[in-house]
Amino acid sequence: QPAVAVAIIDSHVAMPALGVVDSGSLMGALGTSAVFLLLDKTARPLPKGIEGTAYSAAIPDAWCYEAGQASFGDLLAWFINAFPRSGNVKDDFAYYDRAAALRSLGAGHVLALDWWNGCRVPFGDSTLSGLLVGMNMRTTAVDIYRALMESICFGARTIVDLLASSGSPIERVVLTGGLAQKNDVLMQMLADILGCSLEIPRLTHPTAIGAAIHGAVAAGIVANYSDGAG
């Protein structure tokens, strides 16, 4: 008889492929937007602003706490499209990333709020908008780009701090998605702002691999998701 695994959310299905199967593991999927999933064996009060939690929704016998950012990579893409340098998007990203890497945190004295597409956490309001402050006649395009990078990293920090406020242990942070794999400057900035090391597995298709692991568990090829992850 063929075995059929139940349907599952795309971000959840990637977790075993990335080795995110244990309590205290936080996964972040970073693309145009961002989602963060934290596993915890213990049921805890949901911190105000965190979007939700469900039991055994991602990994059996574990609570999965979920929160996200409405804009992440698409905020940087907006800047590149609004203020192009060469007409080649890839080259423009490379230029601004290199230039931003040479600046220290807050060096341009420009601050950004990353709500270009509304705010998921902590307010859950799609009508809210982003902002830039601190600009003057000396402000450069790189200052603005760097501020936008900092803003999405601090948005992620807001989520991590809220999750930790419930008492949930966060022992490791595992990231996936195009930005995690391709933008080393942004990942270093995120590590600095979170104050922790980041694990970035070099998997090209973690969602597909995770789906295969789910199928293997359903078919009895492996005993559980931990074995599949190994």
Locations of regions flagged by a protein language model:
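Active-site core segments that coordinate phosphate-bearing ligands/cofactors
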Residues: 1-230
